[in-house]
Amino acid sequence: MSAVRPHPVVHLELHTGDREGASAFYADLLRWRTERIDAGCASYHALALGGAFGGGIVQCPARRPVWLPYVEVDRVDEVTERASRLGASVLLEPREGPTGWRSVVATPEGGEIAFWQPKARHRGWGAAA
């Protein structure tokens, strides 16, 4: 039997209607440092977790704040297609960014999860191995 490599959570994003308040709360509570980054259409507060950036806080019209985990995969297109076959709804089709490819799906139970395929020069921080 061959071993299957587990897919680690490598990035966390908080989607909230109060980015500034959330940034202050987590800075005070957990000493998470935030850095504002211009992401084109909106600013993004990157989170320094354990000395490296591994998350972010995004301003969005949310009924309630939601944490979105990004799971590293080998082939984002294949995993997104497999999730769809298993009953997930694709919220964001696989797309390329500066450091990799990502997609987002809603699970059959209504949760959301993002898939991340890094480019060779970029590796996630590995929050959970």
Question: What is the role of each PLM region?
Answer:
Residues 31-37, 89-94:
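Short secondary-structure junctions
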Residues 19, 70-112:
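Vicinal oxygen chelate
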Residues 26:
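Catalytic core of tubulin tyrosine ligase-like
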Residues 32-66, 105, 112-118:
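Conserved short beta-strand elements that form part of the metal-binding/catalytic scaffold
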Residues 48-62, 69-72, 81-84, 91-92, ...:
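Conserved, structured core segments of small domains
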Residues 1-23, 67-69, 118-129:
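N-terminal beta-strand motif that seeds the catalytic metal site of vicinal oxygen chelate
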Residues 11, 19, 36-40, 48-49, ...:
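Residue-level hotspots at or immediately adjacent to binding/recognition sites across diverse folds
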